[in-house]
Regions:
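Hydrophobic, lipid-facing positions within transmembrane beta-strands of outer-membrane proteins
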Residues: 12-18, 80-84, 147-151, 189-193
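Short glycine/proline- and aromatic-enriched beta-strand/turn motifs that initiate or cap beta-hairpins
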Residues: 1-21, 96, 142, 170, ...
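Outer-membrane beta-barrel "beta-signal"
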Residues: 155-161, 187-199
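Repeated loop/turn-to-beta-strand initiation elements of outer-membrane beta-barrel proteins
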Residues: 27-30, 93-96, 159-165
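Outer-membrane beta-barrel strand-turn architecture
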Residues: 22-26, 88-92, 157-159, 199
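Transmembrane beta-barrel strands of outer-membrane/channel proteins
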Residues: 34-38, 98-104, 165-169, 197
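Outer-membrane beta-barrel transmembrane strands
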Residues: 74-89, 142-148, 152-154, 163-166
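Extracellular/periplasm-exposed beta-strand and loop segments of Gram-negative cell-envelope proteins
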Residues: 1-11, 39-78, 105-146, 173-190
């Protein structure tokens, strides 16, 4: 279990894309498009009896079991995203939107280190071994296809420039359900503040 979240640092993420808006009525419309986006974070945490598979930095081999100590994790994922959003206009300048999105992760990293703690072989009652530092890399185990919900708003500041704020909430975890090294689901949840050029 995670006993404390000692540091959480979301990275500066870049999103580039093209969107198409189709009005359906005076107020309602549909927006879709294609986005290239990256999402990332760095986390420092203290855990107890956390299932871990890692490699000892001293070259003594792989360690598997229940880890108690510090964990540092680095996440950097790049996606191609296809949103399908219903939009509602609140006057000439404001517009809100909501709907599903579908993402394909074409490049991803989930790596880090376990440090200053101990691991018990196989489970919390196993043989205890002190570990100063062990590294892990689960990048190849990341799920490629993601989907979720997006909601947000857009303000037309000028004729060709809008300011937007969006929240994306992933509905499937970043690892497959049969992945054993992380025993709970991790869902991608991100907020985006940005600008768009209106043609």
């Amino acid at each position: 279990s995670i006993r404390s979240l000692d540091a959480y640092r979301p990275t500066l993420s870049v999103m580039l894309g093209l969107g198409v808006y189709k009005p359906l009525t005076d107020k309602w419309g549909l927006t879709t498009g294609l986005r290239l986006e990256n999402k990332g974070m760095d986390i420092d945490a203290t855990v107890k009896n956390y299932h871990m598979e890692a490699v000892n930095e001293d070259g003594s081999g792989k360690v598997v079991g229940a880890w108690t100590g510090g964990v540092r994790t680095k996440v950097r994922n790049n996606y191609l995203t296809f949103p399908i959003l219903a939009t509602y206009s609140l006057g000439k300048r404001w517009q809100v939107s909501a709907g599903p999105y579908f993402s394909w992760m074409f490049d991803g990293e989930f790596s880090g280190e376990a440090h200053d703690g101990y691991i018990r072989d196989t489970d919390p009652t196993g043989t205890k071994a002190e570990v100063s530092r062990a590294i892990y890399d689960f990048s190849s185990d990341l799920r490629r296809f993601h989907w979720g919900l997006q909601a947000g708003g857009e303000f037309r500041a000028y004729k060709h420039l809008s300011v937007m704020l969006n929240l994306q909430w992933g509905l499937n975890g970043i690892f497959p359900s049969d992945f054993e090294s992380v025993t709970f689901d991790l869902y991608p949840i991100y907020a985006t503040l940005g600008f768009s050029y209106v043609f």
